[in-house]
């Protein structure tokens, strides 16, 4: 998917309207608790400012449901960005309207302003054409650098592209397309996918799309129990999607028919209850006690999966191996993160599809050992499903 990028345009003297993902966590005092998303947008922001562009930033924050919600103002974000850039950031009171427009027109080369939360207007998520047109009038060139919302057809991601002469991808989206796109279109082999998470229903489309592309799939997370039930095993009180057992059988048959190695765990860490202080035992998957539930992959599985990971040249990971929020059941997920970092050190390309897997890598302190950690959980999942992302499709080719 070749899209025009920030590198293809001249910003000098132009009003550059950039959609960023500044949906950062705030504490009760309105203080930003993690500014990673702001830092990730800095390369694109600096590119515009250093080449003499007049930058107008827009983002959403939280879920104000189309109403002005003072505690979800982007003002704290503008302050933090100002510190990071060591320059003033003009904060608008709205994202459209006469006052915001006058502030945009008053910008000089190398200056930056932040529009107020897009989702204070219900028209944003409805992709309202009039609202999109009004946003578009703020700038002369549109840059989308918000991969996390690229799978949403909103006014600031999709609608706006119909009303600006030039719309291009920022550096963050360019990087996402390069790694995720290449992994799916032209991977170095062996190509291995690791899929975790609680439910098969959330991963059906990913599995379907990956069956045409990968050599090996490793399965973890609670969805393994629906597969085991489909194979006739007793799984104790483990989570099972009863209505997906037939589908699990079908997926196992499909993998076999396509000659794909689809590995399921050999053992699990079982617990008497879903709790940190529950009694636990390591058991083979054919001997899960009927009063216990599996909450993580076991040591034999960790060993097998780690060996598979070290054989691969391209690795995509989406979803944890167990209930990694509870330390007692985080071992499998953290071990997979370490194996991924080891494989990367040996020259493999490792890609993590945002969300919980990314959180696990951060928890293990291994983010610098991974080739690419996607900035969008839902967007990367839809990309892996082979779906077109509206916010990217709308950009200039």
From Swiss-Prot:
GO cellular component terms, A-Z: cytosol
Keyword set includes Transferase: yes
Native source species: Prosthecochloris aestuarii (strain DSM 271 / SK 413)
Main location: cytoplasm
Gene this chain is encoded by: pgk
Protein name, per record: Phosphoglycerate kinase
Keyword Ligase recorded: no
Residues at which substrate binds: 21-23, 37, 60-63, 119, 152
Entry-linked HAMAP family: Phosphoglyc_kinase
PANTHER family assigned to the protein according to its UniProt record, in alphabetical order: PHOSPHOGLYCERATE KINASE, PHOSPHOGLYCERATE KINASE 1, CHLOROPLASTIC-RELATED
